[in-house]
Amino acid sequence: MKFFIDTANIDDIRAANSLGILAGVTTNPSLVAKEGVSFHDRLREITKEVSGSVSAEVISEDAEGMIEEGKELAAIAPNITVKVPMTLEGLKAVKVFSELNIKTNVTLIFNANQALLAARAGATYVSPFLGRLDDIGQDGMTLISAIAEIFDRHSVSTEIIAASIRHPLHVTDAALNGAHIATIPYKVLEQLVKHPLTDQGIQKFLDDWNSQK
Protein backbone atom coordinates (compact mmCIF):
# COMPACT_ATOMS: atom_id res chain seq x y z
CA MET A 1 0.00 0.00 0.00
CA LYS A 2 1.23 3.48 -0.89
CA PHE A 3 1.06 6.64 1.21
CA PHE A 4 -0.42 9.98 0.20
CA ILE A 5 -0.58 12.95 2.56
CA ASP A 6 -3.93 14.68 3.03
CA THR A 7 -3.12 18.35 3.42
CA ALA A 8 -2.52 21.62 1.60
CA ASN A 9 0.13 22.72 4.10
CA ILE A 10 3.38 23.01 2.18
CA ASP A 11 5.58 22.52 5.27
CA ASP A 12 3.84 19.25 6.15
CA ILE A 13 4.17 18.11 2.54
CA ARG A 14 7.89 18.88 2.50
CA ALA A 15 8.39 17.10 5.82
CA ALA A 16 6.55 14.00 4.62
CA ASN A 17 8.37 14.02 1.30
CA SER A 18 11.75 14.12 3.05
CA LEU A 19 10.99 10.68 4.56
CA GLY A 20 11.07 8.94 1.20
CA ILE A 21 7.63 7.37 1.60
CA LEU A 22 5.37 9.90 -0.10
CA ALA A 23 3.65 8.80 -3.32
CA GLY A 24 1.18 11.67 -3.65
CA VAL A 25 -0.96 14.39 -2.08
CA THR A 26 -4.70 14.90 -1.69
CA THR A 27 -6.28 18.29 -1.08
CA ASN A 28 -9.82 19.58 -0.84
CA PRO A 29 -11.43 23.04 -0.64
CA SER A 30 -11.58 22.88 3.18
CA LEU A 31 -7.87 22.10 3.49
CA VAL A 32 -6.90 24.87 1.06
CA ALA A 33 -9.17 27.39 2.82
CA LYS A 34 -7.28 26.77 6.09
CA GLU A 35 -4.06 27.89 4.41
CA GLY A 36 -5.37 31.29 3.32
CA VAL A 37 -3.57 31.16 -0.03
CA SER A 38 -4.51 31.10 -3.70
CA PHE A 39 -5.64 27.59 -4.66
CA HIS A 40 -3.76 27.56 -7.96
CA ASP A 41 -0.61 29.06 -6.44
CA ARG A 42 -0.56 26.42 -3.72
CA LEU A 43 -1.05 23.65 -6.29
CA ARG A 44 1.94 24.98 -8.23
CA GLU A 45 4.01 24.83 -5.05
CA ILE A 46 2.88 21.29 -4.23
CA THR A 47 3.45 19.90 -7.71
CA LYS A 48 7.00 21.27 -7.67
CA GLU A 49 7.67 19.44 -4.40
CA VAL A 50 5.96 16.13 -5.20
CA SER A 51 6.27 14.17 -8.43
CA GLY A 52 3.38 11.81 -7.66
CA SER A 53 -0.35 12.40 -7.99
CA VAL A 54 -1.69 15.65 -6.52
CA SER A 55 -5.48 15.63 -6.18
CA ALA A 56 -7.19 18.99 -6.65
CA GLU A 57 -10.96 19.20 -6.21
CA VAL A 58 -13.49 20.96 -8.41
CA ILE A 59 -16.27 22.94 -6.72
CA SER A 60 -18.83 23.16 -9.53
CA GLU A 61 -21.93 21.01 -9.12
CA ASP A 62 -22.72 20.49 -12.81
CA ALA A 63 -20.68 18.42 -15.25
CA GLU A 64 -19.97 21.34 -17.57
CA GLY A 65 -18.53 23.42 -14.76
CA MET A 66 -16.53 20.49 -13.40
CA ILE A 67 -15.02 19.84 -16.82
CA GLU A 68 -14.06 23.48 -17.28
CA GLU A 69 -12.49 23.65 -13.82
CA GLY A 70 -10.78 20.29 -14.24
CA LYS A 71 -9.13 21.33 -17.48
CA GLU A 72 -7.76 24.45 -15.78
CA LEU A 73 -6.44 22.39 -12.87
CA ALA A 74 -4.88 19.75 -15.13
CA ALA A 75 -3.06 22.51 -17.03
CA ILE A 76 -1.17 23.52 -13.87
CA ALA A 77 1.06 20.43 -13.89
CA PRO A 78 1.10 16.96 -15.47
CA ASN A 79 0.75 15.24 -12.08
CA ILE A 80 -2.53 16.94 -11.16
CA THR A 81 -5.41 14.52 -10.56
CA VAL A 82 -8.84 16.13 -10.76
CA LYS A 83 -10.93 15.32 -7.70
CA VAL A 84 -14.63 14.94 -8.48
CA PRO A 85 -17.58 14.30 -6.13
CA MET A 86 -19.60 11.10 -6.43
CA THR A 87 -22.73 12.43 -8.14
CA LEU A 88 -24.45 11.84 -11.46
CA GLU A 89 -22.91 15.05 -12.77
CA GLY A 90 -19.57 13.95 -11.39
CA LEU A 91 -19.75 10.68 -13.32
CA LYS A 92 -20.46 12.59 -16.53
CA ALA A 93 -17.38 14.70 -15.90
CA VAL A 94 -15.23 11.65 -15.12
CA LYS A 95 -16.21 10.09 -18.44
CA VAL A 96 -15.03 13.20 -20.30
CA PHE A 97 -11.83 13.47 -18.27
CA SER A 98 -11.08 9.82 -19.02
CA GLU A 99 -11.46 10.49 -22.74
CA LEU A 100 -9.07 13.44 -22.37
CA ASN A 101 -6.54 11.31 -20.45
CA ILE A 102 -6.95 13.49 -17.37
CA LYS A 103 -6.62 11.46 -14.17
CA THR A 104 -9.49 11.58 -11.70
CA ASN A 105 -10.12 10.83 -8.05
CA VAL A 106 -13.80 10.30 -7.25
CA THR A 107 -14.34 11.38 -3.67
CA LEU A 108 -17.03 10.99 -1.00
CA ILE A 109 -17.51 7.27 -1.66
CA PHE A 110 -19.64 5.58 1.00
CA ASN A 111 -20.75 2.32 -0.62
CA ALA A 112 -19.41 -0.25 -3.07
CA ASN A 113 -21.93 0.59 -5.78
CA GLN A 114 -20.65 4.16 -5.89
CA ALA A 115 -17.09 2.89 -6.22
CA LEU A 116 -17.95 0.53 -9.08
CA LEU A 117 -19.90 3.22 -10.93
CA ALA A 118 -16.99 5.63 -10.61
CA ALA A 119 -14.55 3.00 -11.84
CA ARG A 120 -16.68 2.15 -14.86
CA ALA A 121 -16.98 5.85 -15.70
CA GLY A 122 -13.18 5.90 -15.95
CA ALA A 123 -11.95 7.03 -12.52
CA THR A 124 -8.26 6.59 -11.82
CA TYR A 125 -8.92 6.47 -8.08
CA VAL A 126 -11.91 6.12 -5.76
CA SER A 127 -11.83 7.49 -2.22
CA PRO A 128 -14.01 5.76 0.39
CA PHE A 129 -14.22 7.82 3.59
CA LEU A 130 -13.47 5.73 6.69
CA GLY A 131 -13.75 8.21 9.54
CA ARG A 132 -17.07 9.61 8.39
CA LEU A 133 -18.51 6.09 8.20
CA ASP A 134 -17.24 5.45 11.73
CA ASP A 135 -19.07 8.61 12.81
CA ILE A 136 -22.43 7.11 11.83
CA GLY A 137 -21.70 3.65 13.22
CA GLN A 138 -20.81 1.93 9.95
CA ASP A 139 -17.68 -0.12 9.26
CA GLY A 140 -15.41 1.52 6.73
CA MET A 141 -13.14 -1.51 6.55
CA THR A 142 -15.99 -3.73 5.40
CA LEU A 143 -16.48 -1.22 2.60
CA ILE A 144 -12.78 -1.23 1.64
CA SER A 145 -12.79 -5.03 1.57
CA ALA A 146 -15.95 -5.16 -0.55
CA ILE A 147 -14.62 -2.66 -3.09
CA ALA A 148 -11.29 -4.48 -3.30
CA GLU A 149 -13.01 -7.83 -3.87
CA ILE A 150 -15.33 -6.44 -6.54
CA PHE A 151 -12.48 -4.70 -8.36
CA ASP A 152 -10.35 -7.84 -8.24
CA ARG A 153 -13.16 -10.13 -9.37
CA HIS A 154 -14.05 -7.91 -12.32
CA SER A 155 -10.48 -6.89 -13.26
CA VAL A 156 -11.03 -3.21 -12.47
CA SER A 157 -7.79 -1.20 -12.60
CA THR A 158 -9.07 1.76 -10.56
CA GLU A 159 -7.09 2.19 -7.33
CA ILE A 160 -8.68 2.50 -3.89
CA ILE A 161 -7.59 5.43 -1.72
CA ALA A 162 -8.54 4.97 1.93
CA ALA A 163 -9.53 8.50 2.99
CA SER A 164 -10.85 10.27 6.09
CA ILE A 165 -8.22 8.45 8.16
CA ARG A 166 -8.23 9.39 11.82
CA HIS A 167 -5.66 7.12 13.50
CA PRO A 168 -2.96 4.49 12.83
CA LEU A 169 -5.34 1.52 13.12
CA HIS A 170 -7.23 2.87 10.11
CA VAL A 171 -3.99 2.63 8.14
CA THR A 172 -3.23 -0.94 9.21
CA ASP A 173 -6.77 -2.13 8.54
CA ALA A 174 -6.93 -0.37 5.18
CA ALA A 175 -3.76 -2.19 4.09
CA LEU A 176 -5.12 -5.53 5.32
CA ASN A 177 -8.43 -5.03 3.54
CA GLY A 178 -7.01 -4.22 0.12
CA ALA A 179 -6.65 -0.45 -0.19
CA HIS A 180 -3.96 0.51 -2.68
CA ILE A 181 -3.29 3.86 -1.02
CA ALA A 182 -3.90 5.52 2.35
CA THR A 183 -4.11 9.30 2.36
CA ILE A 184 -3.30 10.52 5.83
CA PRO A 185 -2.95 13.78 7.76
CA TYR A 186 0.60 14.60 8.82
CA LYS A 187 -0.26 14.09 12.51
CA VAL A 188 -1.31 10.50 11.75
CA LEU A 189 1.90 9.96 9.78
CA GLU A 190 3.86 11.02 12.87
CA GLN A 191 1.86 8.57 14.97
CA LEU A 192 2.67 5.71 12.59
CA VAL A 193 6.36 6.11 13.38
CA LYS A 194 5.96 5.98 17.14
CA HIS A 195 5.78 3.08 19.58
CA PRO A 196 6.68 3.25 23.29
CA LEU A 197 8.88 0.16 23.05
CA THR A 198 10.85 1.79 20.23
CA ASP A 199 11.45 4.84 22.42
CA GLN A 200 12.39 2.64 25.38
CA GLY A 201 14.75 0.60 23.22
CA ILE A 202 16.53 3.70 21.93
CA GLN A 203 16.89 5.05 25.45
CA LYS A 204 18.29 1.72 26.70
CA PHE A 205 20.85 1.62 23.91
CA LEU A 206 21.92 5.18 24.77
CA ASP A 207 22.06 4.45 28.50
CA ASP A 208 24.13 1.30 27.94
CA TRP A 209 26.48 3.14 25.60
CA ASN A 210 26.94 6.06 27.97
CA SER A 211 27.55 3.73 30.92
CA GLN A 212 30.70 2.44 29.19
CA LYS A 213 32.28 5.88 28.89
Swiss-Prot record:
It comes from the Bacteria. CDD domains: Transaldolase_FSA (cd00956). Coiled coil: none annotated. Gene3D superfamilies: Aldolase class I. Its EC number is 2.2.1.2. The keyword Cytoplasm applies. This is Probable transaldolase. The lineage of its organism: Bacteria, Bacillati, Bacillota, Bacilli, Bacillales. The gene is tal.
